[in-house]
């Protein structure tokens, strides 16, 4: 996902090419990110023999079993000693699986203590001590399996058990002498690096710490900030977008479409009294107003002879009649326009130019509103954007609010510098790469991401394991 951490110090580690297990940090109380692995291409290769094979070095990462830190193991060890002293008779009577489980825990604590002692030794250790360190980790890994008689024997005798090692990269001094990485190790993880080959590998990166933003008073104190990110397309939001993006041409076009509609509705409500006022200014009585209404009805159903009679009446009235005819036609058009706003478009010539503008607007929008599921991610489009859709490889600028299922906000970007990333390149959690694809500039949608497309079983600070994440996102720019 978006980065939930910030760098605080430089991380650097030298891993010699002797196959030794090098702890990633002196203790497991620091969180760090490895961003580069490199070798010195001018360094002379160190071959084990006089072989003429190609010089290269392979970096591997080894992780101790999770959930076995030193304090917990020591506490378990002390608790087991107390329980043995207090209930020695019970153990003699109630033998069975419980005894094996206690023995396994004691053995795990002993192996972990052996591992910590080996880690605290000087770097200039001999090969035998190196082998003991590897054997201690091997026993610790094996201790996580269910305890059996065979396991007890193997744990004591099979010190050469191979650990599960993951290859990170292979470097050579000719072409690939450095490799960008993005490996984050959480606080409390016990991680080791190992290099085999002809060159020492140098790891660099940063010590990092989670970004801790206060969220307890979010609902009470951040109401105004919440208005900066509202899914309803109101004028405040359009203004915010203009300030952030520096582009207001499209928003002005929309405002030009909507304001005349509002004006016509208001004038429609006020035009009825004006008809009477205009007649009053020209000193027409109530009888004349009634006669005018009858004339309007006669116009819709009269034959050719009645039209000629009406023309004669207008000629007899002189200029006053001509002046009055124009306001009547104008008022009729305005009433007709207001009616169209409520009941839909009309084929009249006066309305046709206005009908093209909403059509053009519909052609610019991208996608469809509604809920759909894409590769396990539930997407609910609240507002469609305009222009081309975001595709893999595009750099996108986003606003977002991230929540858990219980409504707790764990992260957000509602103002200031937008969050940017390259879509489809693994710079964010997989659910974001899926959920943001297809959005257009100005689009808003809600993305519901299952845990296996977010942070999985482990989670991160502020997000428990197996958490489903809900994001309200808005696309500001596609680069």
Swiss-Prot record:
Principal place of residence: nucleus
Enzyme Commission number, as recorded: 5.2.1.8
Claim: Cell membrane is one of the keywords in the record: no
Positions with biased composition (Acidic residues): 40-49, 68-93, 148-162, 214-256
Domain PPIase FKBP-type: 393-479
A molecular function (GO) term: peptidyl-prolyl cis-trans isomerase activity
Regulation of activity: Inhibited by both FK506 and rapamycin.
Localization in the cell: Nucleus
Keyword Mitochondrion: no
InterPro entries, sorted: NPL, PPIase_dom_sf, PPIase_FKBP_dom, PPIase_Fpr3/Fpr4-like
Region (Disordered): 39-106, 141-162, 205-367
GO CC terms of this entry: chromatin; nucleolus
Coiled coil: none
PANTHER family registered for this protein in UniProt: 39 KDA FK506-BINDING NUCLEAR PROTEIN (PTHR43811:SF19), FKBP-TYPE PEPTIDYL-PROLYL CIS-TRANS ISOMERASE FKPA (PTHR43811)
Stated family: Belongs to the FKBP-type PPIase family. FKBP3/4 subfamily.
Task performed by this protein: PPIase that acts as a histone chaperone. Histone proline isomerase that increases the rate of cis-trans isomerization at prolines on the histone H3 N-terminal tail. Proline isomerization influences H3 methylation thereby regulating gene expression.
Protein name according to UniProt: FK506-binding protein 4
Organism phylogeny: Eukaryota, Fungi, Dikarya, Ascomycota, Pezizomycotina
